[in-house]
Each structure stands twice: as structure tokens, then as C-alpha cells.
Amino acid sequence: MKLLALFPFLAIVIQLSCWELGTDALPSGGFVRTKGVQFSLNGYPYYANGFNAYWLMYVASDPSQRSKISTAFQDASRHGLTVARTWAFSDGGYRALQYSPGSYNEDMFQGLDFALAEARRHGIKIILSFANNYESFGGRKQYVDWARSRGRPVSSEDDFFTDSLVKDFYKNHIKAVLNRFNTFTKVHYKDDPTIMAWELMNEPRCPSDPSGRAIQAWITEMAAHVKSLDRNHLLEAGLEGFYGQSSPQSKTLNPPGQFGTDFIANNRIPGIDFVTVHSYPDEWFPDSSEQSQMDFLNKWLDAHIQDAQNVLHKPIILAEFGKSMKKPGYTPAQRDIVFNTVYSKIYGSAKRGGAAAGGLFWQLLVNGIDNFQDGYGIILSQSSSTVNVISQQSRKLTLIRKIFARMINVEKWKRARGQGQVGKRGHKINN
């Protein structure tokens, strides 16, 4: 029996089943792969119900604060979260990882080492981003400034994507991260299955080139560079999901602005293994009503999940979403609606074997790091209705994975049994 034929049956079973199937926990070791429109881990479908915590390296660089990292992963694991996304960059400025091109701060690198070690201990996979689009933690601007100080004729942050020296700086940073030897786990990053994927950049944009050609060429070049150094890990571009010239009919879905990216064309590039989308209706449409923002969210998610499934044929993660407590009129119920909407779209696709493979809320915090609270932060240890929504999604996706695992194991057993009962001439062998 083919697994595709069982997807409708699976949906019914999930609705009728209790949460705990009694199946032994599936192993979390090994490298995450893609298989069609799904992620796969150790031969079974894998789902990324997780969170963003960009501050992990920064906080862990101070040994006296590392207990906060342990608490974060412990809390996440208790709530069934499986993936965390964080920064592998801090370029120039205060507490830099990279002081100047090729010059690194060992304390910061050891902070990232520790975060990866704790993630590994708690069975959580990590997505590491190589650079930032924005000025915080250096970003494109810092790379361009470094090139300008060496005499390059660069005048705009957008030169990050085209200047040869800037690109060399960036490629060298990628190489430094991939070849980093973790001082805690004694494993090079490029060989560490705790890392689920690399991300080229957090939210790349090139507004000076609305055609999208600059970023298309840059992603093509950098994806090839990463894959030349590391064939173990998945790679994604860090895109927010804005449509471009390759799908003009979908550009009406975009929020206002010029971004220089193309969701379809950028994600078709060889070496880009899965698709990402971000969504912040309260930021992108601040003057719109709550209902209008939710209408946008539903259309935005539907379009991207469908395109990942039917056009790109790759898994998709909603890599950033949330609801700010700092917006006028905010209520916890509004945030719950946003989370439930996102999770329902993911679950509806996943239970049918579709492309939606998970969501990472922005952002996870713990007690004692109030300076990182941007309005979106969620502390799992503080009981709230949103935390219950998060935990429920973890249980749902875990159940799907267990059911798929049972189906796969039954198919393996049937094939093995059939082979064992047939002799060399095709005669059935009696027991």
C-alpha cells in the first residue's frame, strides 16, 4: 500500500486518537534531510515546531549567564519544541563575534558552542543564520563599511550583494563558521547533526534592485559556496516570502514596499533545500484593523504553502511569526488567534503529507533578560493561554510523526515478510 493513499485515513485517525500513542520516542539524532515536500530524520517525517532566540550566543558568551541558555532549552523541550533559530553573526561593534574580516572573538564563539551543546543535550535542532540584513549586530552595513575602509568604491548597503570584496568577506565568514570546532561537543559545526540548517541571511532585501536580479545572483553564488564546503546540512535563504517578477499575479499579496526578492525564483535555486516565509501583519499593516490583518495572514499562508507544495516542491517553514504586546489595543486573545491560525495552517497541511513542515514563533525569552523583550517575547515558564496553544501544536505534530512512523514500519515489515516467504524460483516457503 502506498503511503499517499493513507493520507485521508491518517487525518481521520488523528482526529479520533488520543494524544499519546504509546510508541517509543523517535530518535532525534542524525541529520535532517528533505524527502519530497517533507523533512526526514532517520527515515521518518520530521516537523519543526519551534522558536527564534537570536540572543543565544550573545548571552552565552558570558559564562555567568549560561544557566539562562540551559533554562531556555529545558523549557522548550518540556513543551515539545524541536527547532530553534538563532544568529551565528555579530559583526563589528560591541561584543562582536567578528571584530573585523576574519578576526574572531573566542568568547563569543564559545558562547555559540555552548548553545549548540545545550540544544544537543535537550534534543533540539538549530538553524544558524550567517548574516543580518539590518544594522543590528553589524549586518550588511558593517560588511560594506569594511570594504569601503579598504578602498572599495561602495556607496550603498545594497553593494553587499554585488561587490567582490564584500562577497569574499562573507564567504570567509561562512567558512569560519562551518569549520568551527565546538569546544564543548568536540565536533566541527559542519559535522554536527544538532544543526538542522544554515541560513544565508536574516531577511535579505535589496530595494535598489526591484527586478530581483541582484539577490537572485547572490543566492545562487552563495548557495553553491556553502554546498561546496558542507554537504551534510540543509540550506535556506532566509527569505520573508515577498513575491517578485516570476509570479506577477502574486505580487498583490505583498505588503507595500520594494524588496528586491522573488519568493518563487529565489527558492528554485539549486542548493536551496527548503522554503521560508515570515509574517508580521501588525508591523506591515499597522493602521489596518485586526480583522484585515488576519485576512492578510490567512491569504499569505495559504498562498505560500500552496506554492511550496505545487510550484517549488519543497518543504516550507514559517520561520518568523508573532504578535506584539506593544501595539495599541493588544490583548492576549489576539495573540492566541494569530498562533492558532498559523498552527492550523501548518497542521492542516502536515496531516495530509503536505509541504508545511513547521513554524518558529518570534521569540522565546527566559526570566532575567528583559533587555531583549521587543514586545513579541514569550516566557514558557509563565503560564499563559498562548503557551497552551504552543504545547498543543507540539502534541499534534508529534502524533502525526508517530503515525507516519508506524505506517512506514508496517510497510517495511510487509516487504520483509514477503521477501522471506518467497524462494529463488518464486515458490512460497512454508514456515
UniProtKB/Swiss-Prot annotation:
Superkingdom assignment: Eukaryota
Tissues with expression: Expressed in stems, flowers, siliques and seeds. Expressed in root vasculature, leaf hydathodes, anther filaments, stigma, sepal vasculature, at the base and apical parts of siliques, and replum. Expressed in the micropylar endosperm and radicle tip in early germinating seeds.
Q: Which UniProt keywords apply?
A: Glycosidase, Hydrolase, Secreted, Signal
User: Where is the major localization of this protein?
Assistant: secreted
The catalytic activity of this protein is classed by the Enzyme Commission as 3.2.1.78
Which residues does the record give as substrate binding sites? 87, 202, 280, 362
Compartments reported by the entry: Secreted
Signal peptide positions are: 1-25
Q: Which GO terms describe its biological process?
A: fruit dehiscence; fruit valve development; plant-type cell wall loosening; polysaccharide catabolic process; seed germination
Q: What is the catalytic activity of this protein?
A: Random hydrolysis of (1->4)-beta-D-mannosidic linkages in mannans, galactomannans and glucomannans
* Stimuli inducing this protein: By gibberellin in germinating seeds.
- Active site per database record: 203, 320
Which molecular function GO terms apply here?
mannan endo-1,4-beta-mannosidase activity
Query: Gene Ontology cellular component?
Result: cell periphery; extracellular region
Which family is annotated? Belongs to the glycosyl hydrolase 5 (cellulase A) family.
The free-text function statement in the UniProt record for this protein reads: Required for both, loosening of the micropylar endosperm, and rupture of the seed coat in germinating seeds. May participate in the hydrolysis of the mannans in the cell wall of germinating seeds.
- Record's protein name: Mannan endo-1,4-beta-mannosidase 7
